[in-house]
Regions:
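Trp- and S/T/G-rich repeat-edge/linker motifs of beta-rich repeat architectures
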Residues: 1-5, 9, 13, 22-58, ...
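Recurrent small/Gly-Pro-centered beta-turn motifs in extracellular repeat architectures
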Residues: 17-19, 70-73, 146-149, 225-228
Length: 265
């Protein structure tokens, strides 16, 4: 365990999620009673049975009596130095009795038995490039989940060094197709953790919005802030040469979600 990456209060306990490149993230909890150091108990290990492909407990959020854990792999879903991934993120649901469910992710056998995604979605909400469940928040009785997608970085990736299978997949559709159709973060919401509605699949129609960095509930609606580093210029390739051009879609953005009965996003 290299880092306590995220913490949350839930069920009268403090929960801590770690980074563990060898075995996968761990979740620990404590009542924080008496004099420190406190008594901690591990409630999840080995990345919830997925190993290093769930390297990091990226985000924790309490929602309707359960603690939701969003996973990821460092560096956006591909830890190149340690050759972990690439792989998309998962979403786990922890209960007060330490039992857990796979909300979104890869079906598998675990020490606790078989786990299947109760939402029906594979890792990344069926989007391979969603390397993190980066941020979660609760508003108006719904859980909001924001991702990080690295698809918009494909033009800058050393694809020629990838496996033959991966190169063929990219070549079949073309890099531009992946950027256009897979670029930009996702935002999903649910009132029960099982049935999900997609708010955006492409960074609010901006593939440069590669991730959701904050979700905040307010009396005026839910506000969602993005990360967008492709600014003020963006490198593009023309006639085999790279050049920087002004990118009007670059720079972070803040979006407000309309509450039920209110018109517009």
């Amino acid at each position: 365990n290299l880092t306590v990456f995220e913490m949350a209060a839930f069920n009268n306990h403090l929960y801590a999620g770690t980074v563990n490149a060898r075995n996968g993230f761990e979740i620990w909890k404590t009542r924080a009673e008496g004099d420190p150091p406190y008594d901690w108990r591990r409630v999840l290990s080995h990345g919830a049975g997925r190993g290093p492909l769930n390297e990091v407990a990226v985000s924790l959020c309490e929602f309707k009596g359960a603690l939701y854990v969003g996973s990821g792999i460092v560096n956006g879903g591909y830890h190149r130095k340690l050759n972990i991934g690439p792989a998309a993120a998962e979403l786990i649901r922890l209960h007060p009795d330490d039992s857990w469910e796979l909300v979104m992710g890869e079906s598998r056998m675990t020490p606790q038995g078989a786990r299947y995604p109760i939402s029906g979605y594979r890792p990344g909400f069926n989007k391979f490039f969603n390397g993190y469940v980066w941020r979660m928040g609760v508003h108006a009785g719904r859980l909001y989940v924001g991702t990080f997608s690295w698809a918009q970085l494909l033009p800058y990736c050393p694809i020629h060094q990838w496996s033959e299978v991966a190169q063929k997949k990219i070549a079949r559709m073309g890099v531009d197709w992946f950027v256009r159709n897979m670029g930009g973060c996702d935002v999903w919401s649910s009132e029960d953790g099982v049935h999900w509605d997609c708010m955006t699949r492409n960074g609010f129609d901006n593939e440069c919005n590669w991730g959701v960095r904050q979700i905040l509930s307010t009396p005026y609606g839910v506000f969602i802030a993005t990360a967008n580093v492709l600014a003020p210029d963006r490198a593009i390739q023309r006639n085999g040469q790279w050049e920087y051009v002004h990118n009007p879609r670059g720079g972070c953005e803040v979006w407000r979600g309309a509450d039920p009965g209110e018109a517009g996003p």
